[in-house]
Regions:
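Extreme N-terminal starter segment of soluble prokaryotic enzymes
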Residues: 1-8
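Conserved hydrophobic/aromatic positions in well-ordered beta-strands
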Residues: 7, 122-124, 256, 276
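C-terminal beta-strand edge segments of enzyme domains
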Residues: 157, 221-321
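Conserved beta-strand and immediately adjacent loop positions that scaffold enzyme active sites
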Residues: 5, 104, 120, 154, ...
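Active-site catalytic loop in hydrolytic enzyme cores
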Residues: 81-84, 89-90, 94-97, 101, ...
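Short, acidic, Ser/Thr-enriched surface-loop or helix-capping motifs
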Residues: 3, 125-126, 258-259
């Protein structure tokens, strides 16, 4: 089967409330599944919001910045215990299994020891299990005061019932070697996770689809001022900057679906919350590869070689033998 319905969730999370956000995600997955979607995608750090307020606060030994960073840590899930009662995402896994859908969730991932956050993409299979976790390789610019650097353990496409799915976070789309690693893993559907989707982000998503000869689900966050706690509204406005989309909105969505020719299947949806749906046909990929295959007949493997260390980098390796 090559025809599939896919969906992007363009609703706001419950900011800094992990439990409430998970329950919202269950409702949104249910809505998308009711509409026929078999792959359901959320934007960058949807759990539990992109922390733009950090860019509007003092970053060094500032009590307010420390307070909100601690809140973000406390409301960010630790991944890895799919069957454990303490798994904060158990309800999301359950709805994925119940509806037999694949869910791709952007989230703030907390390390299982210490207090580091990662900007991650979690892929949950239709049995509720973790299929992949990709951690953003290099947090962009001032994001480095929030997130640690990821590794290449999740830099791959994985098999799902709707095709081979991979993803990158925001400015990773301007990392040519990361793109090539995903192309080489046989990616058919690419998740481009963003907080905002300005014109240049749309250029990157469309270019990725054309280069990789794949479908791209470009997921943008929808967030209004009233979605934030009162104390975070002004720092968030400062963090977003002067290009906030409209009065009352901080991020206006802009989610889209792009075909392997780089043209829109669904043009950017801006200024309203909802589920963005699209029908895709994977047989289009073979036709698109007729004139471009960046890891095949358009490549020069005798000239260029890319090496990727795909080990999970935990820093401390303990041997007891």
């Amino acid at each position: 089967m090559t025809h599939h319905t896919v969906a992007i969730v363009q609703y706001p999370p419950a900011v800094l409330d992990l439990r409430a956000s998970v329950m919202r995600s269950v409702a949104h997955v249910t809505e998308a599944a009711d509409a026929g979607a078999r792959l359901i995608v959320f934007p960058e750090t949807w759990l539990t919001c992109y922390p733009a307020w950090a860019f509007g606060m003092a970053g060094w030994d500032d009590a307010e910045a420390r307070h909100w960073h601690a809140r973000l840590l406390a409301e960010s899930p630790v991944l890895g215990a799919t069957a454990d009662a303490a798994d904060a995402l158990a309800d999301l896994r359950a709805v994925a299994a119940n509806r037999q859908v694949t869910v791709v969730m952007g989230l703030n991932e907390r390390s299982n020891t210490g207090g580091t956050l990662y900007n991650s993409i979690l892929t949950i299979g239709p049995d509720g299990s973790t299929l992949n976790v990709h951690r953003k390789l290099v947090p962009t610019h001032s994001e480095r005061i929030i997130w640690g650097a990821g590794d290449a353990a999740g830099l791959r496409a994985i098999d799902t019932p709707v095709g081979r799915v991979g993803g990158l976070v925001c400015w990773e789309h301007w990392m040519p070697l990361a793109r090539q690693a995903l192309h080489a893993s046989g990616e058919e559907i690419h998740i481009a996770a963003w907080p905002e989707t300005s014109d240049i982000h749309q250029v990157a998503a469309r270019s990725y689809a054309f280069e990789g000869r794949c479908f791209v689900l470009s997921a943008g966050l929808y967030l209004a001022v009233e979605d934030l706690p009162e104390a975070l509204r002004e720092p968030f406005r400062i963090g977003v900057g002067p290009e906030a989309p409209a009065s009352g909105l901080l991020f206006d969505g802009g989610s889209s679906v792009i075909g392997p020719d780089g043209h829109y299947v669904v043009e950017p949806v801006r200024g309203r919350p909802g589920i963005v749906l699209a029908e895709i046909d994977l047989s289009a990929l073979d036709r698109a590869h007729h004139d471009l295959d960046v890891v095949g007949h358009s490549a020069r493997n005798d000239v260029f070689e890319l090496r990727v260390d795909a080990r999970r980098r935990d820093g401390v390796v303990v041997r007891r033998d």
